[in-house]
Amino acid sequence: MSVFTHLSLSPINIAAALFPTKAYNSAYAKGEQMINETMYACGAESSIIREIFSYGLERKAQIGAENVFDFSLGNPSVPAPAAVAESIKKALELPSDQLHGYTPAPGLPQCRTAVAESLNRRFGTSYEGKDVFMTVGAAASLTCTLNAVTNPGDEVIVIAPYFPEYRVWIEKAGCTCVEALADEDTFQLSVDNVLKAITDKTAAVIIDSPNNPTGAVYTRDTLTRLANVLCEVNAKRDPENPITLISDEPYREIVYGAEVPWVPSIYEHTIVCYSYSKSLSLPGERVGWILVPDTNPQAARLMSAVAGAARTLGFVCAPALFQRVIIDCIDEPSDVEAYARNRTALTDALAEYGYTYVEPDGAFYLWVKALEPDANAFCERAKKYELLAVPSDSFGMPGWFRLGYCVSYETIVNSLPAWKQLADEYRQK
């Protein structure tokens, strides 16, 4: 018999029949919607980076964009290479079903092969297209990888300071985010601190080199020592349960003379996550990849787990158009010179004004010591001069702030008097 047989078909009566709980019926009767409170909290509390960026947009509308110096976001001001536009024009000549149709979930075979062959040319490897899974950018690469290599209750180690969304993605995978403090002098990862953070529940370690937010590039020696420690831990574990090293590499191409070692050649249980948001200045197009190296003893099972994670998280396929762009532009160089020019102009001036910072070897961020212990208070004071910086607390380390110098050169130069005025104000306190 239908549950509706003896009920008038009002929404409240239907809800009461289908969901006979006091909490639901009370909320429904009041016109409230039952929602996932965890997701609500995550959405209601936006990241500090996005909050500052939104504030900057408001101020620009009020006083003019040229009067606001927004260093909050890693949004490249360097144009995408000309080859990108040419590739798009070429793709537009394709039949609509090819241009806009679904691709295979792991990506176009020719795109996956192009990525593998590019890596082989650069690092002397022998990867194949089957080792590459195309994604909707680095965020998707990381969330898929985390969900593929962890189980609820596991722990994932991050190197503090770290990109704040790591914690969000780790916790939403049902895991605990464990911070291992970087070396406070060099901001190289501290192998000793990682070792102290490892427990029987450790499933993975995330590294990010060149690093966001410090600009540090982890040396081969540092990575080799980390690999040795992880191998020692793995030797005491079930062989089917090694610690996975997740190498997050969206800034690999943006370096100032430093070597960025190829991590899979150092530690076999490595998965690489990559994005073209920074190297090709395509942050809004959302295209990247996951590499599960064929040298990883669990490669076949891991790739299936990555595919399963992408499926359950709702990532149908990477953007078809931009997979074709990647095929054409796979080895296009980044305009590192523009970022180097910005870096020099900013660091020379801040040093003169008395600021202390970490010399960045890569990426396009400057990690600067706040002029008072409370970085949040410092960044609020900086707003008086229309200087928008991200306080370090959300990166897992107090007392610093991050500047994204991927802005225009004019923004750098025009902001310098304000940085001097801010420093002068602190000297007079």
Where are these regions (language model features)?
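Short, surface-exposed loop/turn segments at secondary-structure junctions
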Residues: Q98-T103
